[in-house]
Swiss-Prot record:
Manganese or magnesium. Binds 1 divalent metal ion per monomer in the absence of substrate. May bind a second metal ion after substrate binding. Residues 35-225 form the RNase H type-2 domain. InterPro entries: RNase_HII, RNase_HII/HIII, RNase_HII/HIII_dom, RNaseH-like_sf, RNaseH_sf. GO terms for cellular component: cytoplasm; ribonuclease H2 complex. Endonuclease that specifically degrades the RNA of RNA-DNA hybrids. It comes from Trichormus variabilis (strain ATCC 29413 / PCC 7937) (Anabaena variabilis). Its EC number is 3.1.26.4. One of its GO terms (molecular function) is RNA-DNA hybrid ribonuclease activity. A divalent metal cation binds at residues 41-42, 137. This is Ribonuclease HII. Coiled coil: none annotated.
Length: 225
């Protein structure tokens, strides 16, 4: 049954302290959790082109030392090659991980915030194993998600599960944009990954927006008449 409101921990005691320093998964309180925990994060929210993509990742406790040794962190702070390496490692170590996304048309129809939450919800619902708790990056709980969740601002710097989700979503989306760049070479997507670089903005002024540009974003609202 779908819930009308997100089931958050506002009135419940989270078994881990958000005031702890370092990774939450290394906190002594983590052992209080009996069940699977998923990290949820998104990428592409600020892009002008392509979908917003989310990932949900469930890591086993046995993987935490390996990922900390590998210096896992927010995907934006990693080089492309390092992200790909870590994504391969996460894919091998994870109990389960899934991708969800919202299309450009959905972004334009329901706005980028709601599309982001939709992508997150889709990624969680694709998991073959249901977690007892979702750690969600940011301050917006995912609506219509019948699973206990906790939002964490800068969660990709606080939780290994969220950092892993950030990396999986980023690598998946970058690969998609790379493939789409051959169809739309004029926008320099190979370099900017759909974000508003100078070359991208100049190309929009010259060629107009493609069908995969977000028409609800001002830089894409260009008339060539």
């Amino acid at each position: 049954m779908m819930l009308k409101k997100a089931q958050t921990t506002d009135n419940l005691k989270l078994p881990i302290s958000l005031n702890a320093t370092g990774w939450l998964e290394s906190s002594p309180d983590w052992s209080n959790i009996s069940g699977l925990v998923a990290g949820v994060d998104e990428v592409g929210r600020g892009a002008l082109f392509g979908p917003v993509v989310a990932a949900s990742v469930i890591l086993p406790a046995s993987s935490f030392p390996q990922l900390m040794t590998a210096e896992i962190k927010d995907s934006k702070k990693l080089s492309h090659s390092r992200r790909v390496q870590l994504a391969q490692q996460i894919s091998t170590l994870a109990i389960d991980w899934r991708i969800g996304y919202a299309t450009t048309a959905e972004i334009d129809r329901i706005n980028i915030l709601q599309a982001t939450l939709l992508a997150m919800r889709r990624s969680v619902k694709k998991l073959k194993l249901q977690p007892i708790l979702c750690l969600v990056d940011g301050n917006q709980p995912v609506q219509d998600l019948p699973i206990l969740q906790q939002t964490i601002v800068k969660g990709d710097e606080r939780s290994l599960n969220i950092a892993a989700a950030s990396i999986m979503a980023k690598v998946w989306r970058d690969d998609l944009i790379q493939r789409l760049s051959t169809k739309y070479p004029m926008y320099d997507l190979k370099s900017n990954k759909g974000y508003g670089s100078k070359k991208h903005l100049l190309a929009l002024e010259k060629h107009g927006a493609s069908p995969l540009h977000r028409q609800s974003f001002r830089p894409c609202q260009i008339s060539l008449d």
